[in-house]
């Protein structure tokens, strides 16, 4: 897709600068060559048009890789309207390229909170009225929640939502438990080809890149504390270790904690004996006073709280690679300490009190991306080859839900289908196979005898649902 439509012919968009479209198109073409699974699905299903009639509301980071996802959905028959799920994550050239192709998009880097909400509203609305959407593609859950709260009538026609990230899945499961979720959901985040690629290998690539772009610091020989050791934490710890940092990990889950130990990381707690009683007295000041860099990776709230921030070493770098900015207590920092912008998405946080500050003060923290996703705020996020698996999952999940036609079911059937589930393993394997082919790899086929011996078919799926990769 390379057509460029002039603003006079199409104005259902808002981006930073439409003149960046040619740049965005050049980068998109390169990204396509690095996304073999997504492009393979585009070729495989284009003739069948499995998304013909699908009207997809999308809210996911508006990057170059997302441009390839959007155009794949369109190539398979869908209509889409799009916004970004983070105020700092948009690549303006990518948004411009999508707008220039005649696809409604509302996103730019550096939105205010009010502009962010406006962009989501414009995604939902067409000509001032709710669009007759029948699918949602979300990252973090904001779009899904807004539709449930402000536009519940739209849910009568929506077949389901596909959710990209851990935080969004937590929100969906919470809504389901409370009886608030009205449409079925596919948990894309926990597909193997998403969680192992995006969450682990993607963070391994992009965290150190973002920190170095933001600070120009040498990382080797310095001490880092990674908060959380799920897939994102694992990738983050590896990212910092390969820079030569002395990496410590803190965890609440004994299994993840065990994995950190087995991977050779020192398991510590920022709290004395691991107990946080909410006071400064419970902080391990000796530990935090030596930390040069702290990164949160959990999807939880206040895992780097105000007392920890007070105890950190002077000039320590603080950042987050989880979805929302509430992993770090930025609200406390805004209320109690002075902020000095060094450059976009890099702030000195002077711990000398609110208001004015002495530029020569050396008691400050360096906060990246205002506590939001550092790899997209201070860099360009995961590379195309990583996002290939995530977005191929999104395409297959959209096809899967669209074919189920949940909105057309009888009430009794709807009650059965109202779930939050992962994509069937066979589809996960389909994504993995396309990715392997992109690397030039060759997968060995089982013989019939071998398949029978382990109780699978020659074509797969090859592992039971409970298998842990």
UniProtKB/Swiss-Prot annotation:
<feature type="binding site">
    <location>
        <position position="198"/>
    </location>
    <ligand>
        <name>substrate</name>
    </ligand>
</feature>
<dbReference type="Pfam" id="PF05221">
    <property type="entry name" value="AdoHcyase"/>
</dbReference>
<dbReference type="Pfam" id="PF00670">
    <property type="entry name" value="AdoHcyase_NAD"/>
</dbReference>
<feature type="binding site">
    <location>
        <position position="251"/>
    </location>
    <ligand>
        <name>NAD(+)</name>
    </ligand>
</feature>
<feature type="binding site">
    <location>
        <position position="375"/>
    </location>
    <ligand>
        <name>NAD(+)</name>
    </ligand>
</feature>
<feature type="binding site">
    <location>
        <position position="194"/>
    </location>
    <ligand>
        <name>substrate</name>
    </ligand>
</feature>
<keyword id="KW-0378">Hydrolase</keyword>
<keyword id="KW-0554">One-carbon metabolism</keyword>
<dbReference type="GO" id="GO:0006730">
    <property type="term" value="P:one-carbon metabolic process"/>
</dbReference>
<feature type="binding site">
    <location>
        <begin position="165"/>
        <end position="167"/>
    </location>
    <ligand>
        <name>NAD(+)</name>
    </ligand>
</feature>
<comment type="pathway">
    <text>Amino-acid biosynthesis; L-homocysteine biosynthesis; L-homocysteine from S-adenosyl-L-homocysteine: step 1/1.</text>
</comment>
<dbReference type="InterPro" id="IPR042172">
    <property type="entry name" value="Adenosylhomocyst_ase-like_sf"/>
</dbReference>
<dbReference type="InterPro" id="IPR000043">
    <property type="entry name" value="Adenosylhomocysteinase-like"/>
</dbReference>
<feature type="binding site">
    <location>
        <position position="63"/>
    </location>
    <ligand>
        <name>substrate</name>
    </ligand>
</feature>
<protein>
    <recommendedName>
        <fullName>Adenosylhomocysteinase</fullName>
        <ecNumber>3.13.2.1</ecNumber>
    </recommendedName>
</protein>
<feature type="binding site">
    <location>
        <begin position="228"/>
        <end position="233"/>
    </location>
    <ligand>
        <name>NAD(+)</name>
    </ligand>
</feature>
<dbReference type="InterPro" id="IPR036291">
    <property type="entry name" value="NAD(P)-bd_dom_sf"/>
</dbReference>
<comment type="similarity">
    <text>Belongs to the adenosylhomocysteinase family.</text>
</comment>
<feature type="binding site">
    <location>
        <begin position="321"/>
        <end position="323"/>
    </location>
    <ligand>
        <name>NAD(+)</name>
    </ligand>
</feature>
<dbReference type="GO" id="GO:0004013">
    <property type="term" value="F:adenosylhomocysteinase activity"/>
</dbReference>
<feature type="binding site">
    <location>
        <position position="139"/>
    </location>
    <ligand>
        <name>substrate</name>
    </ligand>
</feature>
<dbReference type="InterPro" id="IPR020082">
    <property type="entry name" value="S-Ado-L-homoCys_hydrolase_CS"/>
</dbReference>
<dbReference type="GO" id="GO:0071269">
    <property type="term" value="P:L-homocysteine biosynthetic process"/>
</dbReference>
<keyword id="KW-0520">NAD</keyword>
<feature type="binding site">
    <location>
        <position position="199"/>
    </location>
    <ligand>
        <name>NAD(+)</name>
    </ligand>
</feature>
<feature type="binding site">
    <location>
        <position position="164"/>
    </location>
    <ligand>
        <name>substrate</name>
    </ligand>
</feature>
<dbReference type="GO" id="GO:0005829">
    <property type="term" value="C:cytosol"/>
</dbReference>
<feature type="binding site">
    <location>
        <position position="300"/>
    </location>
    <ligand>
        <name>NAD(+)</name>
    </ligand>
</feature>
<dbReference type="InterPro" id="IPR015878">
    <property type="entry name" value="Ado_hCys_hydrolase_NAD-bd"/>
</dbReference>
<comment type="function">
    <text>May play a key role in the regulation of the intracellular concentration of adenosylhomocysteine.</text>
</comment>
<dbReference type="GO" id="GO:0033353">
    <property type="term" value="P:S-adenosylmethionine cycle"/>
</dbReference>
<keyword id="KW-0963">Cytoplasm</keyword>
């Amino acid at each position: 897709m390379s057509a460029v439509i002039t603003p006079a012919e199409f104005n259902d968009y808002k981006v930073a600068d439409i003149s960046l479209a040619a740049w965005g198109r050049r980068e998109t073409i390169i990204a396509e060559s690095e996304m073999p699974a997504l492009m393979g699905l585009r070729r495989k299903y284009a003739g069948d048009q499995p998304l013909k009639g699908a009207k997809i509301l999308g809210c996911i980071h508006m990057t170059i890789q997302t441009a390839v996802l959007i155009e794949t959905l369109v190539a398979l028959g869908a209509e889409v309207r799009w916004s970004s799920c983070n105020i700092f994550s948009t690549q303006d050239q990518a948004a411009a390229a999508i707008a220039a192709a005649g696809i409604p998009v509302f996103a730019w880097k550096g939105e205010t909170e009010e502009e962010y909400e406006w962009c989501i509203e414009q995604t939902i609305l067409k000509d001032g009225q709710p669009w007759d959407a029948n699918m949602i593609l979300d990252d973090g859950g904001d779009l899904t929640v807004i539709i449930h709260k402000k536009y519940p009538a739209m849910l009568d026609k929506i077949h389901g939502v596909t959710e990209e990230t851990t935080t969004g899945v937590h929100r969906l499961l919470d809504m389901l438990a409370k009886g608030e979720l009205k449409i079925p959901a596919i948990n894309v985040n926990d597909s193997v080809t998403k969680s192992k690629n995006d969450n682990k290998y993607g963070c391994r690539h992009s965290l150190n890149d973002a920190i170095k772009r933001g600070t120009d610091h040498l990382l080797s020989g310095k001490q880092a504390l990674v908060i959380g050791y799920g897939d994102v934490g694992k990738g983050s710890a590896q990212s910092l270790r390969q820079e030569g940092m002395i990496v410590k990990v803190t965890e609440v889950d004994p299994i993840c904690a065990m994995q950190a130990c087995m991977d050779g990381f020192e398991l510590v707690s920022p709290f004395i004996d691991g107990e946080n009683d909410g006071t400064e007295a419970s902080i391990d000041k000796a530990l935090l006073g030596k930390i040069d860099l702290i990164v949160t990776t959990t999807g939880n709230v206040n895992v780097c709280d105000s007392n920890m921030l007070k105890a950190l070493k002077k000039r320590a770098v603080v950042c987050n690679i989880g979805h929302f900015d509430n992993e770090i207590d930025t609200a406390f920092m805004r209320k109690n300490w002075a902020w000095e912008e060094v450059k976009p998405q890099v702030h000195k946080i002077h711990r000398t009190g609110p208001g004015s500050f002495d530029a020569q003060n050396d008691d400050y923290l360096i906060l990246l991306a205002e506590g939001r996703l550092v790899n997209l705020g201070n860099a360009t996020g995961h590379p195309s080859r990583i996002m290939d698996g995530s977005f191929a999952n999104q395409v297959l999940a959209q096809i899967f839900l669209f074919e189920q036609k949940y909105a057309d079911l009888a009430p009794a059937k709807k009650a059965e289908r109202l779930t939050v589930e992962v994509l069937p393993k066979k589809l996960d394997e389909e994504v993995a196979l396309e990715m392997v082919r992109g690397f030039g790899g060759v997968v060995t086929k089982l013989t019939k005898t071998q398949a029978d011996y382990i109780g699978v078919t020659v074509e797969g799926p090859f592992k039971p649902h409970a298998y842990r990769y």
